[in-house]
């Protein structure tokens, strides 16, 4: 299951192979898939449903995040164009920082959060019991269920 960032060679593809596929065939497949980004392999084909939910559909979640950030910025008085430019650059730059850093995402989040500051205040809302984590839990579970249904 590839994802759409493959269009700019920044994708990630998760693949599985039947036991009868030779090591040479698997290697060739890996080389072809690497042309559009990272490649991971799973032995258990049942994992393809959660993979689809997380990374196959994941770009849409990021794009929705950008839309939501830009809309919130516009509601605070920024022009829609400026709000979108800020949201796009923030998500793109944060993604690149995450990619280049050896620190986990949680530590990068802590690094940008000053105690009692603006980020801390926003994170209180986003990390509340009814915040972003339960929404993602439900969304990915729904996508995984739908992937199973579509697979028959």
What are these regions (language model features)?
Residues 1, 16, 113:
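Short beta-strand segments
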Residues 1-2, 41:
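Conserved beta-loop-beta element that borders a ligand/cofactor-binding pocket
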Residues 5-6, 101:
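Alpha/beta catalytic cores of group-transfer enzymes, especially the acyltransferase/condensing modules
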Residues 12-50, 61-101, 146:
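Internal alpha-helical scaffold of NAD(P)-dependent oxidoreductase catalytic cores
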Residues 49-60, 109:
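A short glycine-threonine-serine/GTX helix/turn-capping micro-motif
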Residues 84, 88-152:
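NAD(P)-dependent Rossmann-like dehydrogenase/reductase catalytic/cofactor-binding core
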